[in-house]
Amino acid sequence: MEGPEIKAVEAVIDNGSFGKRTLRFETGRLAQQADGAVAAYLDDDSMILSTTTAGSSPKENYDFFPLTVDVEEKMYAAGKIPGSFFRREGRPSSEAILACRIIDRPLRPLFPHTLRNEVQVVETVLAVNPDDAYDVIALNAASASTMISGLPFEGPVSGVRLALIDGQWVAFPRWSERERAVFEIVVAGRVIENGDVAIAMIEAGAGKNAWHLIYDEGQTKPDEEVVAGGLEAAKPFIKVICEAQDELKKIAAKETKEFQLFPEYTDELYARIDEIAHKDLDEALSIAEKLPRQDRIHEIKEHVREVLADEFTDMDDAEKDKELGNAFKELQRQIVRRRILTEDYRIDGRGLRDIRTLSAEVDIVPRVHGSALFQRGETQILGVTTLNMLKMEQQIDALSGPQSKRYMHNYEMPPYSTGETGRVGSPKRREIGHGALAEKALVPVLPSREEFPYAIRQVSEAIGSNGSTSMGSVCASTLSLLAAGVPLKAPVAGIAMGLVSGDVDGKHIFKTLTDILGAEDAFGDMDFKVAGTSEFITALQLDTKLDGIPADILAAALQQAKEARATILEVINECIDGPAEMSEFAPRIITTSVPVEKIGEVIGPKGKMINQIQEDTGAEIAIEDDGTVFISSEGGEAAEKAKAIIDQIANPHVPEAGETYNGKVVKTTSFGAFVNLTPGTDGLLHISQIRNLANGERIDAVEDVLKEGDTVEVIVQGVDDRGKISLAIPGFEDQENNARPSRGDRDDRRGGRGRGDRDDRRGGRGRRSERDDRDFDDRDDRPRRRRSDDFEDDYDDRPRRRRSDDRDFDRDDRDDDRPRRRRSADRDFDDRDDRDARDSRDDDRPRRRRSSDRDDRGDRDDRRGGSRGRGRGSDRNPRYATDDNYDDYRADREERTERPRRRVRRDFDPFED
């Protein structure tokens, strides 16, 4: 089977020392039923399919050209699966919407404005190199697909992104190269009859690292002359790409179709309206205030409608009313433009370079972190700044380029700003575009993450609109950020420039306007927005209704904008000349660092530790992969407290004997309470010490005095060689814990004879000494604890089985090499209910003797193979024969046993005749 005929052309972009890039246009393989379909490739690893399709019939009720541009970002293009719940692409991202605007703005003026057939351009991103941006590729692909679609299109138009890197303008720069860009500019244009390139669209801004590159490394500053040079540098690249599109049109274009055009009005109707309303409109268009002017114009229009009610009866009412409105609007346009071109006279009486009245205020909204109101004439912008932790920075699921940003600028323009009603809710494309432009203007002067570790959200509320709300947003944002305490490197201001062109006395002239009104924007040829500091430009945007504007006209407009920018900066500096003190309601963020290997300890299992710190202190904590810790709280006190805790975990201080702590009870047991001294460090406050909190009286349970969560003042009594900490109540630190007498006191307690001689304690073989001779005052009268409740795991050296109620840090101590007892022999001495069952075993395994198997305590000799006086080795369990601590363990074990002791008569003497 014979395949489709594929036709392709190439444009080679030579960047000198930065290498070459190849842009290839291919048609014939994909989307064969679209009017025009082109696959555009950049270096064969980024691919975008562009299709252009027109509706078969016109939309007669439309009074505008219905062009739609859509960008479809396919996540598979970057090897990703969409992160949404349904795992498929949904609404377009902000990046896709901005790409749509870049494509729409240069294409729209090249269609007949009286065309009423729907035209849709769809850009599908099929593959993208993660080091490349796709927006400019899509712009060129859109022009190419429209060129071969057979539509009435006065193309081609081409676009190029240039980056000023190390003093050279580089076309189609990679993301990695753009890190060192001082300035970036996207320029779209078309080749005109004289071979020059007319500029149709500009989107530009200083690089995010521009300040560092300019003032620390001495790179070129992007002032007006440098930016004008960038416009000239773009022309050769635009021409090369336009030539490739012309070549593609020659070999693949369809024949241009005939489309019905719908004139907006008839010449006769326009002449009649001019005759009726010219004088009145001339006067109305001299009213400076917007709303009174609009009211007067509406009255004139109604008068014209009444006069023409009986005229032009060959039109139906709807058609007549639509053409009347179009002709009336065109008459206003001609009056405004003629006065500017011939008299340098503007609607509100200003000169061409004059700026409207300016005012600026800060701190007008209570409790917010920063606020400001900037007003230029009737354009009024409220700026509000919010600061938060860096973890609140926006995550971007982009195909390429940055995946997050810490400065987020949102622009909103409600319908009441123009005195109208309308939809309120999610942002429209225009609002997203204006927010992105204001963001681009301010990013170069923001402090670095290290200098100011905050995520910043800036909202610009256009609460009054009469021209250039986007540049008003830049000014209001500068004021608001400074009021919030953000240490901007320099204040930024913005101004909107306009253009009116036409023939006067047989000569085509251009008049550039400073600070345009809404009506001048609507009736003019250009909206040229310029933002920057006093020394260089930070953002540019150009929209035009013309096929293109000469570069020298734009260069002159840049110089005119610089004058206006300086005037606005003076007003800003008078209002606030530097960053203010941060609001008391703004979070205070401090930083610390922990070793990477300690990050897990700070976070804890399943975030237990970090969540506990946040709960206890009220601070917010974020930890980055390199160990940098950001801690935030209102006022800063909680943040300092959290920092101290984190530092203690990362560089722990081991409590020492004699140190006093206000600790929190984290667990209670039958033998005492565990008290948290520092994060991750607990100590045991024995029940004998807890009695001191009850005036020394006997207590039945620890919970009668201390409960979990209580705070208690304790003193460190001692730290053993394994780091286990015993605590005491201050003033009673010399008191011995009954459950754990020190090793050195055994002689006093046992008559000084050690394990080999018990006569003093028992009064001879098998006999206990008198109770009054014992150190434990009332031991025999105390209720006995079951061994299962004996939780003194921290203070003996005996290995033991894992039990479900063991504390986590108890388990960590089981790293000794002592052999473990068999589980079958590891029984509680009080488990006597199943004694008979155990005795019925018929195996020959040796068993331990149980206390119930002996008639008297003196039967120990049978169990241990002889008298205790036979020597230290003869009474040792062979399983622990090699353990040097075995004797100590047995001594402790006997003193803590839970077995009921048999009462022995004091007057009984077994040796009596």
UniProtKB/Swiss-Prot annotation:
Positions contributing to Mg(2+) binding: D521, D527
PROSITE patterns listed in its UniProt record: KH_TYPE_1 (PS50084), S1 (PS50126)
GO CC terms of this entry: cytosol
Residues covered by the S1 motif domain: 658-730
Gene3D superfamilies named in the record: GHMP Kinase, N-terminal domain, K Homology domain, type 1, Nucleic acid-binding proteins
Enzyme nomenclature, EC number: 2.7.7.8
Sorted UniProt keywords: Cytoplasm, Magnesium, Metal-binding, Nucleotidyltransferase, RNA-binding, Transferase
UniProt cross-references to InterPro entries, sorted A to Z: ExoRNase_PH_dom1, ExoRNase_PH_dom2_sf, GPSI/PNP, KH_dom, KH_dom_type_1, KH_dom_type_1_sf, NA-bd_OB-fold, PNPase
Localization terms from the record: Cytoplasm
Occurrences of domain KH (ranges): 587-646
Compositional bias of kind Basic and acidic residues: 742-789, 797-865, 872-898
Catalytically driven reaction(s): RNA(n+1) + phosphate = RNA(n) + a ribonucleoside 5'-diphosphate
Cofactor needs: Mg(2+)
Molecular function, one GO term: polyribonucleotide nucleotidyltransferase activity
Coiled coil: none
GO BP, sorted A to Z: mRNA catabolic process; RNA processing
Role noted for this protein: Involved in mRNA degradation. Catalyzes the phosphorolysis of single-stranded polyribonucleotides processively in the 3'- to 5'-direction.
Alphabetical list of HAMAP family matching this protein: PNPase
Protein family membership: Belongs to the polyribonucleotide nucleotidyltransferase family.
Protein name per its UniProtKB record: Polyribonucleotide nucleotidyltransferase
Record gene name: pnp
